[in-house]
Amino acid sequence: MSNIEQLARANVRALTPYQSARRLGGNGDVWLNANEYPEAPAFQLTLQTLNRYPECQPVQVINRYAEYAGVQPEQVLVSRGADEGIELLIRAFCEPGKDAILFCPPTYGMYAVSAETFGVERRTAASKADWQLDLESIEAQLDGTKVIYVCSPNNPTGNLIAREDLRQLLTMAQGNALVVIDEAYIEFCPQATTAVWLDEFPHLVILRTLSKAFSLAGLRCGFTLANPEVIQLLLKVIAPYPLSTPVADIAAQALSREGIAKMKANVEEITSARRWLSDALKDIPCIEEVFPSESNYLLVRFTASPSVFKTLWDQGIILRDQNKQPSLAGCLRITIGNRYECERVVAALQSLPGINA
């Protein structure tokens, strides 16, 4: 061990970093592994004040997002992607070495990585066979749990968590823990948002992003919706200038009437492509099951997923391997691309009839 490594915190030395799509790499021309929108938006920078520091919480961005989400501006915090929101909640509410977070695998990996980075215990309540919450398991672990993360629609399974279960969880956790509902993909099923419950449940927190339906993954702009008291606590630990001036500029444009209309058109396009791809995949011999989805990706179980993954990788089609997630043996996640990209996937898979493990 080098002297530098010895200086590092023990938990950081032992940390396995989150394996993002870009970290995993690849040399493809069909990128269907990061749940990105397939086309770049046509925004142009309009602000020319790069010599000045930006606002900590850009007023125009906050106001426009509040109007879009149907909440009050004091219930909104903007950050460097929803990932920063995940981290801020742990920093503000969890004592390292004492408190815990809880999440429900299979799910998004950054909840665990963020907690481990700050020396906070990670607890899990594995989802049931239908990928719904195991409320009994969660309730049994509430003592010492400060933050509960639930992803709905869930990444990578694509399903919504039952609303009655979310309400039961909120009632169960009241006075004990924050319940954080990650709505990164909510634009694909807006009727399922829990933002309408914010005034009813002061411990409810909602995470949002411009990375998915708004087609701005490269912008790194996310939002936390919560009770004003929670927002004020998060403002104590957020960096003084979380959003650069160009990011705030583009985010405000994306949240204009025209920007929101374009986002809704994106959603219609992706939803249509998802239906087409789901139907096309069901008759392919190497596929065991195509799971229903309320998002911009499909989870698919293959007869021999490692072979499928490598074969498509070699053809420049990059998917996301989910085999290491609990209960997802044999599964790959396919982002919904444009029609050409979806057709490439189908053609590549049709060339693999009868593939076996």
UniProtKB/Swiss-Prot annotation:
One of its GO terms (biological process) is L-histidine biosynthetic process. Pfam families: Aminotran_1_2 (PF00155). CDD domains: AAT_like. GO terms for molecular function: histidinol-phosphate transaminase activity; pyridoxal phosphate binding. Pathway: Amino-acid biosynthesis; L-histidine biosynthesis; L-histidine from 5-phospho-alpha-D-ribose 1-diphosphate: step 7/9. It is an enzyme of class 2 (transferase). Its cofactor is pyridoxal 5'-phosphate. SUPFAM superfamilies: PLP-dependent transferases. Keywords: Amino-acid biosynthesis, Aminotransferase, Histidine biosynthesis, Pyridoxal phosphate, Transferase. Signal peptide: none annotated. The modification N6-(pyridoxal phosphate)lysine is found at K212. Transmembrane segments: none annotated. Homodimer. Belongs to the class-II pyridoxal-phosphate-dependent aminotransferase family. Histidinol-phosphate aminotransferase subfamily. This is Histidinol-phosphate aminotransferase. The lineage of its organism: Bacteria, Pseudomonadati, Pseudomonadota, Gammaproteobacteria, Enterobacterales.
